[in-house]
UniProtKB/Swiss-Prot annotation:
Keywords: Methylation, Ribonucleoprotein, Ribosomal protein, RNA-binding, rRNA-binding. Residues 135-154 are annotated as: Disordered. It holds the Pfam family Ribosomal_L3. SUPFAM superfamilies: Translation proteins. GO terms for cellular component: cytosolic large ribosomal subunit. Belongs to the universal ribosomal protein uL3 family. One of its GO terms (biological process) is translation. One of its GO terms (molecular function) is structural constituent of ribosome. InterPro entries: Ribosomal_uL3, Ribosomal_uL3_bac/org-type, Ribosomal_uL3_CS, Transl_B-barrel_sf. This is Large ribosomal subunit protein uL3. Part of the 50S ribosomal subunit. Forms a cluster with proteins L14 and L19. One of the primary rRNA binding proteins, it binds directly near the 3'-end of the 23S rRNA, where it nucleates assembly of the 50S subunit. It comes from the Bacteria.
């Protein structure tokens, strides 16, 4: 993982280009991420930043975390996340500094990770896009049933990973190579092209595109 930011998904809108074409964008609010720890090759074997996001009452922070925050002289956050760094990335930053939206620029492509909406228990038609069975011709109870899930005596079991009904959503998902359309430094907003995983108000993690990093090597 490369350097990134933790933000809050606000919702979707659209913006118009000079030629009049419409671009759907997701608005992400990035409250400044506070660096709580800097990991180095000498002490930890790799370079990374640990950042705190959001705010939390000091009464709700346990003693080990409270000491961790006070050592870095930063306010307690809702969550701690770690971003691994390259050899040349943000070499001057230190604990207590803030990371803001200006570490990204317009036109840059990023990967965004978020928790998808939970949709509860779902059947195979909704969950795995199975086709339905015949509406008539003797079928009266199995219109949305999955059908056979295995063979006979051999192998005598259902294979692991078989697509069946179950919990849908509420899993982490990463969308790759999403373009940043606009960076609003004054309001701490990123406008990212397309849809991002999760419900409005959910946490999203924005990092540099992994595919772009491979191309640059």
């Amino acid at each position: 993982m490369s350097i990134g930011l933790i933000g809050r998904k606000c919702g979707m809108t659209r913006i118009f280009t000079e030629t009049g074409s419409s671009i759907p964008v997701t608005v992400v609010e990035v409250i400044p991420n506070r660096i709580t720890q800097v990991k180095t090759v000498e002490t930890d074997g790799y370079r990374a930043f640990q950042v705190a996001y959001g705010k939390k009452s000091s009464a709700r922070v346990n003693k080990p975390l409270a000491g961790h925050y006070s050592k870095a002289a930063v306010e307690a956050g809702n969550a701690l996340r770690e971003f691994r760094l390259g050899n040349e990335e943000l070499t001057e930053a230190k604990a207590g500094d803030e990371l803001k939206v200006d570490i990204f620029k317009e036109g840059q492509v990023v990967d965004v990770r978020g928790l998808t909406r939970g949709k509860g228990f779902a059947g195979t038609v909704k969950r795995h896009n199975f086709r339905t069975q015949d509406a008539t011709h003797g079928n009266s109870l199995s219109h949305r049933a999955p059908g056979s899930i295995g063979q006979c005596q051999t192998p005598g079991r259902v294979w692991k990973g078989k697509k069946m009904a179950g919990q849908l959503g509420n899993v982490y998902c990463t969308v790759q190579s999403q373009e940043i359309i606009k960076v609003d430094v004054e309001r701490n907003l990123l406008l990212i092209k397309g849809a991002l995983p999760g419900a409005p108000g959910g946490e999203v993690i924005i990092t540099q595109s992994s595919k772009k990093r491979k191309e640059d090597k």
